[in-house]
């Protein structure tokens, strides 16, 4: 039995009878065997590596790190996500089987961190690419905070109704790389429409003919001087 939420045994009945529903049985089995795909890009991931040791022993939660997204039902993002890495992250998420969950670990993953103020190549929050279930703030978060986030995710899984989670996500998801919320169809290939790609404000409104003509004239002027 799992002591998180909703035990399978109905205590109003006799001890020889177990009363439950298929949905509760599915939730109980999934929350006890979350297999994470580790997507670490920066220093926050070093704190997560501490959980593998004997002091915290995250194996007791049924966590088995996987190297393939097709074998994982949880992706844990830690560190800065750049614009070039955004399609790869979306592709990994789309390759995970349903139901799947996301934990955003660290300030850089949640808001872009200190790189989001004047950087044109940093995604301002991973939730602009994939839906996030648990936010874990910190720079970096402590291993105890990671365990608390996993516990909260297990509680969420135990209360979940499978149909209510699957159908809304298949109809509309947020996929964009220009730091703005955009609801559209699912992207199963990791490719983006050209209209969603980020463009520099200095050249986005200039026609290509005028821009390249101006650039060539500047280059020739520098050569003359």
Swiss-Prot record:
GO terms for molecular function: 4 iron, 4 sulfur cluster binding; iron ion binding; NADH dehydrogenase (ubiquinone) activity; quinone binding. GO terms for cellular component: chloroplast thylakoid membrane; respiratory chain complex I. SUPFAM superfamilies: HydA/Nqo6-like. One of its GO terms (biological process) is electron transport coupled proton transport. It is a peripheral membrane protein. Its cofactor is [4Fe-4S] cluster. It catalyses: a plastoquinone + NADH + (n+1) H(+)(in) = a plastoquinol + NAD(+) + n H(+)(out); a plastoquinone + NADPH + (n+1) H(+)(in) = a plastoquinol + NADP(+) + n H(+)(out). Keywords: 4Fe-4S, Chloroplast, Iron, Iron-sulfur, Membrane, Metal-binding, NAD, NADP, Plastid, Plastoquinone, Quinone, Thylakoid, Translocase, Transport. PROSITE patterns: COMPLEX1_20K (PS01150). Its EC number is 7.1.1.-. Binds 1 [4Fe-4S] cluster. Gene3D superfamilies: 3.40.50.12280. It is found in: Plastid, Chloroplast thylakoid membrane. [4Fe-4S] cluster binds at residues 43-44, 108, 139. HAMAP family: NDH1_NuoB (MF_01356). NDH shuttles electrons from NAD(P)H:plastoquinone, via FMN and iron-sulfur (Fe-S) centers, to quinones in the photosynthetic chain and possibly in a chloroplast respiratory chain. The immediate electron acceptor for the enzyme in this species is believed to be plastoquinone. Couples the redox reaction to proton translocation, and thus conserves the redox energy in a proton gradient. NDH is composed of at least 16 different subunits, 5 of which are encoded in the nucleus. Belongs to the complex I 20 kDa subunit family. This is NAD(P)H-quinone oxidoreductase subunit K, chloroplastic. It comes from Platanus occidentalis (Sycamore). The lineage of its organism: Eukaryota, Viridiplantae, Streptophyta, Embryophyta, Tracheophyta. The gene is ndhK.
């Amino acid at each position: 039995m799992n002591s998180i939420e909703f035990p399978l045994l109905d205590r109003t009945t006799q001890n020889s009878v177990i009363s439950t529903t298929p949905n509760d049985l599915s939730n109980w089995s999934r929350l006890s065997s979350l297999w994470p795909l580790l997507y670490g890009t920066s220093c926050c991931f070093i704190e997560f590596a501490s959980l593998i040791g004997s002091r915290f022993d995250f194996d007791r939660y049924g966590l088995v790190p996987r190297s393939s997204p097709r074998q994982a039902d949880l992706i844990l993002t830690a560190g800065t996500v750049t614009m070039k890495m955004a399609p790869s992250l979306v592709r990994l998420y789309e390759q995970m089987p349903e139901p799947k969950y996301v934990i955003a670990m660290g300030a850089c993953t949640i808001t872009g961190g200190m790189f989001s103020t004047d950087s044109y190549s940093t995604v301002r929050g991973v939730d602009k690419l994939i839906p996030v279930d648990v936010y874990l703030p910190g720079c970096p978060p402590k291993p105890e905070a990671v365990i608390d986030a996993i516990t909260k995710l297990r509680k969420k899984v135990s209360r979940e109704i499978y149909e209510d989670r699957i159908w809304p996500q298949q109809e509309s998801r947020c996929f964009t790389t220009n730091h703005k919320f955009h609801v559209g169809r699912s992207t199963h290939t990791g490719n983006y429409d050209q209209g969603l790609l980020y463009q520099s404000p200095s050249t986005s409104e200039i026609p290509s003919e005028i821009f390249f003509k101006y650039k060539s004239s500047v280059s020739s002027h520098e050569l003359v001087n």
